[in-house]
Curated annotation (Swiss-Prot):
UniProt protein name: Oxygen-dependent coproporphyrinogen-III oxidase
Stored InterPro entries: Coprogen_oxidase_aer, Coprogen_oxidase_aer_sf, Coprogen_oxidase_CS
EC supergroup of this enzyme: oxidoreductase
Function, as annotated: Involved in the heme biosynthesis. Catalyzes the aerobic oxidative decarboxylation of propionate groups of rings A and B of coproporphyrinogen-III to yield the vinyl groups in protoporphyrinogen-IX.
Cofactors that this protein relies on: a divalent metal cation
Pathway the protein contributes to: Porphyrin-containing compound metabolism; protoporphyrin-IX biosynthesis; protoporphyrinogen-IX from coproporphyrinogen-III (O2 route): step 1/1
Annotated active site: H108
Species in which this protein is naturally found: Shewanella sp. (strain MR-4)
GO biological process: protoporphyrinogen IX biosynthetic process
Length: 302
């Protein structure tokens, strides 16, 4: 299958959405996902699946979208100006999970496929995606296990893959105005096509399939950890960083808004509750300070 085949990619993505939702429902044990299918006037559509007020997850959204358009938006051609004016097809699964318990990290994952067409020319295509972890009260064993899972799924594709995409993740999920990373990273890749369609698709599948393998053990380990108002207030404050990053820097959010995407689905990543506090500084030696001192800068975890 050397020729890019969007049909097999779409089939995988729909199955991935189903499997991830089933896995999250099992972890929660109480709530289930509601499905909301939508169509886009310019072409395409998708299904947003959202779980709210569960026993474990305050809100979890797992979105599938498949959109088409006559011309690529500015967000997609900013670093590929030669693609301006091409028609495009974009599909992917994107998820964000906001747990109730502050000891369970927030997480985000995304896998996507993009193909651009022009009469008389070969299609230009690529895969992208990754997953990342945003703890509030981090445990080093959780972070190391998360990165070990990421490294393990990369190894069949080459020894250089994990370090490369781990570094890209650290650089991408960074808030310059705060001078801190959004969390402890994971994997991030984009413009993946150099190895040909089959191998590139294999890697995208490995990342998508690896997400629950990495996240589920952390949820199981931390979901019964007792917490109080202090931890909840800090969790809500740190969720503000998620909002800041997604609305100011995230390419996917900008792409969705610029292509006339479905606003409810694009902003599904927003936490249901969040707070800001003027000039907050954690108390020295506190668990909150541990996050700032040891986890919000790139580190080698494995």
């Amino acid at each position: 299958m050397s020729v890019p085949d969007a049909t097999v990619v779409k089939a995988f993505l729909l199955d991935l959405q189903n499997r991830i939702c089933a896995g999250l429902e099992q972890l929660d044990g109480q709530a289930s996902f509601a499905a909301d299918s939508w169509t886009r006037t310019e072409g395409g559509g998708g299904t947003s699946r959202v779980l709210t007020q569960g026993a474990v997850f305050e809100q979890a959204g797992v979105n599938f979208s498949h959109v088409t358009g006559a011309a690529m938006p500015a967000s997609a051609t900013a670093h590929r100006p030669e693609l301006a004016g091409r028609s495009f097809e974009a599909m992917g699964v994107s998820l964000v999970i906001h747990p109730k318990n502050p000891y369970i990290p927030t997480t985000h994952a995304n896998v996507r496929f993009f193909i651009a067409h022009k009469d008389g020319a070969d299609p230009v295509w690529w895969f992208g995606g990754g997953f990342d972890l945003t703890p509030y009260y981090p445990f080093e064993e959780d972070v190391r296990e998360w990165h070990q899972t990421a490294k393990n799924l990369c190894l069949p594709f080459g020894d250089d893959i994990y370090p490369k995409y781990k570094k890209w993740c650290d650089e991408y999920f960074f808030l310059p105005h705060r001078n801190e990373t959004r969390g402890v990273g994971g994997l991030f890749f984009d413009d993946l096509n150099q190895a040909g369609f089959d191998k590139s698709f294999d890697f995208m599948q490995a990342v998508g399939n690896g997400f629950l393998t990495a996240y589920a053990p952390i949820v199981e380990r931390r979901k019964e950890t007792p917490y109080g108002e202090r931890e909840r207030e800090f969790q809500l404050y740190r969720r503000g960083r998620y909002v800041e990053f997604n609305l100011v820097y995230d390419r996917g959010t900008l792409f969705g808004l610029q292509t006339g995407g479905r606003t409810e689905s694009i902003l599904m990543s927003m936490p249901p509750l969040v707070r800001w506090q003027y000039a907050y500084t954690p108390e020295a030696g506190s668990p909150e300070a541990d996050l700032y001192d040891n986890y919000l800068k790139p580190r080698d975890w494995v």
